[in-house]
Amino acid sequence: MAPRSVQIVLFDGFELLDVFGPVELFGLLPEHFAVTFLAPGEAPVRSSQGVTVNADHTYAAAPAPDITLVPGGLATREVITDEAFLAWLRGHGTTARLVTSVCTGSALLAAAGLLEGYRATSNKYAFRWVETFGSTVEWVPHARWVEDRDRWTSSGVAAGMDMTVALIRALYGDDVAAEATGMAELDYRTDSTQDPFAALHGL
């Protein structure tokens, strides 16, 4: 069986760990996952931490993926007003077998119409802002991550790694998930409802 293709949607100002936490885990399992990066154009994309990434494909040239992942970051406040980006994301998301997000990436999914009728979560610090998007999204405040059919969304930043472990387990079982977490020496949460940050931010 060929590895599942995982496409990471990049934009200037994305949150670094939103991307490279999951990429670390996927990358430890090359027989199961093949990761590529997407960008608006040919130029490198700069994270909010100043690290630049060269993408494999432009948005326009991206093939249909098995899994797409949309990160968050402070720049989502600007990106979410880009109607051309949202239109592209809407079309791209419909070609993916699984649509996932980390942090405020779920706001982008919601604004693109990709979470209508789904349960979802997001970064708790920004939750009140995020939940203004998507008319029929059921936003879940007390969740480390939420799986709803072909949509997976996580809470803020590091929570993306917990979601990724759960996704790997769902696709390939406990042994493969344990292989990745063992190599990464990752102490992760297995209960998606354990989220201390919801209470911390008054949710």
Where are these regions (language model features)?
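A short glycine-threonine-serine/GTX helix/turn-capping micro-motif
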Residues: 149-156
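Short, acidic/turn-prone active-site loops that include or flank metal/cofactor-
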Residues: 124-127, 145
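Extended, subdomain-level signal for the structured scaffold at the beginning of enzyme domains
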Residues: 1-99, 106-111, 117, 128-142, ...
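Short amphipathic alpha-helical segments and their helix-coil junctions
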Residues: 6, 147-148
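Anionic-ligand binding patches
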Residues: 120
